[in-house]
Amino acid sequence: RQVLALFGAGHVAQALVPILAQLPLSVRWIDNRESLTPTEPLPANVDYLCDDEPVGEIPLLPAGSWVVIMTHDHQLDFELAEKALKHPDLPYVGMIGSQTKAKRFVHRLQSKGISDGQLSRFVTPIGLSDIPGKLPVEVAVSVSAQIIRRLHGVNATEAPLTADTTKEALHDTQ
């Protein structure tokens, strides 16, 4: 199973985990707030870890793990992104946030010596841009849709299906 490390246990992560749990993933859900430790039993493919220093979990991830960052703390998000991008065996580092946050983080990461090659693994804001909405469940669906595309080997930046491309695809099969 593909390992996915999810950093953060806020509203969006809580909406995302039940979706991820139904996919062929091994989810490591990590947060530094004891108060957000789930009280209900988690699915067998989801492990929750409360860790005061979540950045220390990055080097412990198996090679090939995907990283999704959605903590409550912008500085922690930055430290997680920087550490994950410096780890060459992590092919996907996705982070929740606005376009403004994304641009600011990319600039800060570049100033810290993160190369364009390393930044090519950084997907922010995470999720499919054509799925609108700010509710936690809407963001979770958008993020999970992007993860499903990756699971199926579809480039996450590939243009989404439109009415025109769907008509063309249907025409090609007739």
Indicate residue ranges for each PLM-predicted region.
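Hydrophobic, well-ordered beta-alpha structural blocks that scaffold small-molecule cofactor pockets
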Residues: R1-A63, M70, L76-L80
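Glycine-rich loops and low-complexity Gly/Arg-rich segments
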Residues: I30-N32, E53-G56, D73-Q75, Y92-M95, ...
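Alpha-helix boundary recognition
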Residues: A21, P59, L85-K86, Q110
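Adenosine-phosphate binding glycine-rich loop
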Residues: I96-Q174
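N-terminal hydrophobic or amphipathic segments with adjacent small-residue motifs
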Residues: Q2-L4, P88-P91, R121, K134
